[in-house]
């Protein structure tokens, strides 16, 4: 699983990660991750809010410096083109599939548009 990892990688490194995973995966192998279709733009305001919460606790960290901006390849199509069967679900659908409602809070609002990716190597 590469959940929570992709936004911390430069766009080219994201592609290389999935290229390496594909090269090393036998048929039937699985990978799971999430993808933010609007990139890090949607995360910016929330990251600043979260950064302020950390600062209030004495942690001097600019969270926006931890993520990489830039145009990324959408993960689902990228994996499909490389021989993976891909299932994509919006975050609210994932919550509903587990019988949960999506929380209405500032902290998780930035995840509302994220897409959960599950893929099986063909």
Predicted region positions:
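Alpha-helical subdomain
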Residues: 1-122
């Amino acid at each position: 699983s590469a959940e929570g990892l992709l936004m911390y990688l430069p766009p080219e490194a994201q592609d290389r990660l999935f290229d390496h995973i594909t090269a090393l995966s036998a048929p039937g192998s699985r990978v799971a991750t999430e993808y933010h279709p609007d990139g890090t733009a949607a995360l910016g305001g929330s990251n600043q809010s979260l950064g302020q919460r950390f600062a209030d606790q004495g942690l001097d960290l600019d969270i926006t410096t931890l993520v990489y901006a830039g145009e990324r390849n959408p993960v689902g199509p990228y994996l499909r083109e490389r021989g993976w069967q891909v299932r994509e679900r919006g975050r609210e659908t994932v919550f509903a599939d587990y019988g949960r409602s999506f929380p209405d809070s500032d902290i998780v609002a930035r995840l509302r548009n994220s897409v959960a990716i599950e893929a099986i190597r063909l």
